[in-house]
Amino acid sequence: MNRFILSLMIMAGGAFASSADNLVLLTTNDTHSAIDIGADGVGGVLPRKAIIDSVRKAEKNVLLIDAGDVVQGSLYFKYFNGDVEYPVANMMNYDIRILGNHEFDNGLDELAKYWKNVKADRLSANYDFKGTVADGIFEPYVIKKIGKKKIGFIGINVDPHSLIIQGNYEGMKYSDAIATANKVASMLRKQKKCDLIVAVTHIGYEAIPGKASDVDLARQSKDIDIIVGGHSHTYVDPATPEKTPYWISNADGKPVLVTQTGKYGRNLGYINIDLDALDKVKDGKRAFEYMYIPVTDRFSPEAYDKDIIEFLVPYKHAVDSVNSKVIGWSMQDMQNNDHAGTYANWVADFAMNTGSDIADELRKSDPSFPNIDMSFMNVGGIRQPMKQGAVTEGQILSTFPFSNRFEIIEIKGKDIIDALKIAAIKGGECVSENITVVSDDAGNLQHVYINGKEMDPEKTYTVATIDYIAQGNDDYVTMANNRSLWQSKEELSQYILNYIRNLTAEGIPLSANPNRRFVTNISKYIDK
């Protein structure tokens, strides 16, 4: 069944071939507070719920699963801290949920407050919360009986080190994702006699070297049949298996289905499992049908959940009022998911300009305060794209939702270079236009140039950044080897808002320098 036919069936009210011998898994991941339907008519909790209701009406055995990061990324979380996302998820009647890293953004106390009220099986096999406020909330696995079959589900979470701010998970103990998943899966298979085992993960389809990923888990497993993944925002689209393979051979050569639906609730994952053919393998595939259901506003208003509509009214009014405040104008589209693209450049150049202005101001009272040599920001902090046209206050607050502080640090060149090695593997990062990072085709760093000269590993540089990076997070561990010179009291987003307002007051629209800072062509950057 292709997804076009599936979509037509959903719109028609669900004319599926329902069977007691089948199990349907509907999956989401990384919805990131995307409550409203997008400007392009895609996403939104109301169309998602309408699709879920249609499938549940048509199929006898349906389980709704979320692979983490329900929160963070829009004004709904910025202003209401989970008061919207968690109740809405409960109204959708999820069966199984796991944590993402952004569930920790407001600390363990807030996490525990909301997750105690989650109406679903709450799974985490490799986070130990004993002795913390979250103790007793999560179980490592759950077994669902579907007909005569036992289906085991395991929750596997991401390594928090250099990803989650340390104080936000203080007291929690992490265990290796792959080792834990395999241990629990083996127990479920051998002791609990499960017929099918599903790992629900928030570790990413792929990861940097040294970090576990879904592909690694699939390859190193023996007892896991399906991985429902999240974290990397990867579109593991069954329509394009050449880009992101979704059948991965395990340690015994048996195919494992690896899935992920991208981000922002733009798709629902749909996995139809033939429970009478669980051991059948043909052409490197199992008896699991996997596809995307696009979440679009194709439904009539009557199909939308009235309780959710009523619940959202006061929150939506507050969000819409901020989203309507125009503060500037952008000359171009800027994508937030391009590590070496225009939005990354714009953010880095904003940081360089603002950091230099701050340094100039500080020198009035301290003439010895150094000039800013470069900026180093993170693409992960840019949560939304920017479209050509009007720029609103709400758009900026949604794009930069974190409570990061602007910071100026001193740090050795060798520590910057080591961090840029990681950035190169990721495909790029937000660095100022006076920086050129040269790598080979595999992403291995070869040279770092600053103002056209090779960066000196032993020299101390002054860098404009954010506290999150300065603490060694986002895998940039060596950036923590710094001396802080100054940190803002206001959040980064306020500096960006003021920067845009000042540009607008001068009649200057937003535009980004398109020149790439991460390159593979070495010849033009050799010192003259």
Where on the chain are the PLM-derived regions?
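Active-site metal-binding motif and surrounding structural segment of the metallo-beta-lactamase
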Residues: 47-67, 95, 189
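Hard-cation-handling environments
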Residues: 282-391
